[in-house]
A protein has these predicted regions:
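Generic detector of low-complexity/intrinsically disordered segments
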Residues: 6, 22, 80-81
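A short, structured beta-strand/loop element
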Residues: 15-50
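Negatively charged, low-complexity tracts enriched in Asp/Glu with abundant Ser/Thr
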Residues: 1-13
Length: 87
């Protein structure tokens, strides 16, 4: 199973794909979330080496960590403040 959830442009040739996936070991099915960089290869995009796969149960903690990183980036002036982003 693979369900593409989002595609985020990274550059003119690359994109980040976020998907729900699963893989099976001997007797266990593991539900995963994947964020992987895909690169343009002719008319298609192919998966690159860069990315992350984590158990779907870790998704809330990962989101919390990314939100903390966003807050820190805004506080450091690396991203516009929420007020500026809304305008």
């Amino acid at each position: 199973m693979e369900k593409l959830v989002a595609t985020i442009p990274k550059s003119a040739r690359d994109e980040i794909r976020v998907a729900l996936t699963e893989f099976t070991t001997k007797d266990t099915v593991h539900q995963m979330v994947s964020a992987r960089v895909f690169f343009e290869d002719g008319p298609e995009h192919r998966p690159g080496r860069n990315g992350i796969n984590v158990k779907v149960t870790l998704l809330p903690a990962l989101i919390e960590a990314l939100q903390a990183a966003e807050r820190e980036a805004r506080a450091a002036g690396l991203l516009p403040s929420q007020d500026q982003a809304a305008a």
